[in-house]
Structures are given as structure tokens and as C-alpha cells.
Amino acid sequence: MAKLNTKLRGCSQESSVSSLLASGSLSGSRSDSAHSAHSSFVYKDQLYSSASEALQAYIDDFDLSREHPGANAVKVNTDGEIGNGLQFSSYVHIPDNAFVNLDPKQHFNPLYYRRETVNDMDAISLTTDDLLRLPADGCFSFPCVPPDHRPNKKYSGRQDSSDIKNSPSFYVDATSKSKNNIVPPYVYTNINGKKCGRPRTPKPINRENKCVSESSLSFPKESSFTEDSAERRLENYPRWLTSQKSDLSVSGVTSIPDVKYPIWLHNQDLLPEANTPRGYKLLNEDEYRPIHSYQTQRANQLLNKIDCFEYTFKPSNLTDSFSEYEGLGNEFKCQCDNPLLPGQSQKPFCGDKIELLILKAKKNLKQSAKDLPKPVEKDDSPCSLDKLEAERTWENVPVAFKSPVPVKADDSPQQSSRTQCVNAFLEDFLNGENQSSTLSGGKHHGPVEALKQMLFNLQTVQESFNKNKTTEPEEEIKQVSEDDLAKLQMKENMMPITRSLHKALQHLSRLRDLVDDTSGRQSPKK
């Protein structure tokens, strides 16, 4: 049977993992089934059936040594007993008599215990399990964890009931339902928060009887202060966590007390008081409900004690020595009123509280109406509807209509476009002759007008040739007579024919002559 007797320290990073795996491979490679069935591994005096379990234990120990460098090595025996070890890396152990000689007023300050238990909060590296073990108010648990107790992952949840009862690391955590005349029984829980053991028999307290013994009035005693401070500490939930639980959208959180009313009801003194008969009746009705939050049960228990203290302070024949106790009682009551901020199971709207609520609502409405700005008169700032319904001058643009032009209907037949253009050209030409052309003035036609004039001149010349062709025979047309030249000279006086036109006409006449000569010479040869 292969055994690996290695003692690993908490902070040692030079552990022989290879030797551990080698021993496991040797034991697992044996062909004999009897030897392989009985093979086991020993790591820190703990037997493991396989090498994987031993390796996992080594990994867990190594991770723990890195998270808590100051922690000692944990030695787990085969019988499940837990050896020496610290719960936290920077946790300071406090003896049982550490809270004997303390100022009573310091018990209400959770920061006092925080300074006592841990010197430097930033130096602590807590895991998720450690954070879950802390109470709701953020300070460490009142009965500290002894140094010889640290649960192992392998044997967590396997402790016997005898070990749980004998373990000194248990404290009072929660209570069950209780009536007005019975103190809620205590339930023993371990450090993991699991309930175990049997509850203590309830101790009867008569609420109606106002006589209190001297033992109950021994206010400065250490036991009463430690008990009250422990109860006060367990009830100190933050307001952001208890005021609006429905808004958190957290389904798995069950330790947060259910809150039905906001905090402003308590600030406005709208919650029912337990001293009034109606409030006492409501408390009785609420406590018989099947589901009751932990905070309500603690508050009812504290109210029973407060009523006893208040009755003892009321007689006027008491000496001045009780004035300090009365001040402490009032302070204790004020602090005990804090858990009742939401008013978990109490009905706030009862009796005269409804009238007070209505009056305060009316007052708030009046104040809000006064704070509103006054409506502005129409003269200063017109309403938007008036602006929208008004006429839009930019849309009604005046349209300028032109006067109708009369159409001249003449009975005479219309002339052709050519004759009209020629007449207009002649009129312009005659008007232009009357005007003296000077270097500085005078009408000068543009290029477009000049082209038009040239076109008109060519058209007139073409018309004249066409007329001559129709009236005279071809032979007479070929020979230019003197009469035609005289007519052309007359037309030159009437129309401004340019030199180019003259040259063009001359070239045309010569070309015709040449054509006629060539045609006449070729005809007799044929």
C-alpha cells in the first residue's frame, strides 16, 4: 500500500506535486485488483481513496494558503475532528472575558467591536463564505470564533449533533414566533448558519404586570448589556436594504425582512404605538400570523422590556440616582424604535392617524399649489392656440394679375411672314438713313441682326431670279440685259447689298457661262 507522507506547510509553494502523482500512478498501475482496491493516499494525516481526491485536497490547501498567508496549516484526522487553524487571515482572537469591563454606551456602537476584533479592515481578504457568515450590520459576530475551529470543505455539513452542542462557536441567531407574554425561544446555530439543536424553553414574562424585580432593573450589569447589544446588533439592517425590498428584484434573498410601509410614515409619527390599546390589539393580531419576520419578533421582545423600564421610571418619588438609568432607557427605546421604521406587520392607518395623514396631505397640496408659477396674462404672452389660429400673412401672398390684352380682329387677309419681315426691314433701313452715323453714337446692329439682314437680302435676290425665270424664256435669262442691270442698280439703292453679295452674283454668272460653253462644245461632237 503506497503512502505519501509529506508535510506541506500553509505558505509553501515548493510542494512535490510530481511525487504525489507518481505515487498515484504507481498504485494505479498495479495489475493486482486486491492491491489496487486497498490502495490509499495520505495527505496531512487524512486517507484518500484516489490520487485525484488527494490532489484536490492539496489544491484546496494551496488556494487557502494564498488567500490567507498568515493562516496555519490545517490537519484533518481520519475521524473527522478539526485541528488548529484560524478562521480569517487577520482575525484577532478575543477571550471570553473581553467584554466584561466595557462602557455601556459603547455597546450600541458597532464600530467599537470592529476596532476590537480587527485592527486593519483593508488587510483582510475574505471569501464568499466568510462574508456570508458576517451579520447584517457589517461587524463581526459577537462571540468570536476560537482559533482551533475551521471547517473543512470535505467534511462540511457532516458534524454530529454532539459535536455541534459541545462546540463553543455557536451563538443566538434567530427566534421563532412568540406571543406578548413569552420571550421568543433561542435557536442554536453553527457558524455556517444551519439551525440545529433544540430551542430553549420559553421564559414567561407577564406584560400586564408592571412590577419589575431588582434583577431586571440591574441595568449596568455586563450580562444585560451584552445580551441587549447582541440583539441590537442583529437587528441593525441598513435602511437601503430594508426600505424597498420589492425594488431589489432579488428572488433568492430570504434573510431580508419584508417591508410593507416606507420610512416616511415613521418619520411623520404615523405608525401605531404599542402602548395604546388599539396598537396593542394590532400587535396581538399580527403576531398570530403564520409568517413573521425576524425583525418583528425582536422588536416585540424589546418593546416588552421597554414598557417595564418606562413604568419603573414614571413615579415621582424616585431619587435622582435613577435619572441616568432613565436617560439610558430613553436612549435604548430610541434605538429600539429604529427596527420598527418600516412597520412590518402593523397597520399604520388607524384611529386618529388617518386624520393626521389627511391634514398633512392637504398641507402638502397647498404648498405645492403656492409653489406653482402664476399663469401669465394674454396681453403679455398669448396662448399658443391663439398663435396657431391667427392669420398667417406669409401664406396669403397677394397675386398680381395682369390686365387682359385686347385682340385686334381685322377683316383684311393676313400677309405672309416673309412680306411682313421685308416691310419691317425696309422701314428700319429708311429710319436708319435719316439718322447721322457718328463715331460716338448711332445704331449698330449686333451679329444676330446682321445675319438676319444677310438672309433677307439673299431671299430677295432669290425671289427676283425666280420671277425672271418664270416670265422670260431661258435664252433671255442666260444673257443679262441692260434692263436687268438697271433694275439691280435700282434695288441697290433701295437695299444695302454688300460687296460679298455682288461678288457672289458675279461668280455665279461666270459659272453659268462656263457651264453653257462646255455644254455647247460637247453637243456638236456627238
Curated annotation (Swiss-Prot):
Q: Where in the cell is it found?
A: Secreted
Q: Give the UniProt entry's GO cellular component terms.
A: extracellular region
> Can you supply a Gene Ontology BP term from the record?
negative regulation of cell population proliferation
- Name it: Lung adenoma susceptibility protein 2
According to its UniProt entry, this protein's organism is Mus musculus (Mouse)
Main site of residence?
secreted
Q: Phosphoprotein among the record's keywords?
A: yes
Annotated InterPro entries: Cell_Prolif_Regulator, LAS2
Q: Where is this region: Disordered?
A: 150-170
Going by the UniProt record, its keywords in alphabetical order are: Phosphoprotein, Secreted, Signal
Leader sequence segment:
1-31
What this protein is reported to do is described as: Might play a role in cell proliferation.
PTM Phosphoserine: list the residues. Answer: 161
Q: Where are the transmembrane segments?
A: none
* Tissues of expression: Widely expressed with highest levels in lung and spleen. Also expressed during embryonic development, at least from 7 to 17 dpc.
Which Pfam families does the entry mention?
Answer: LAS2
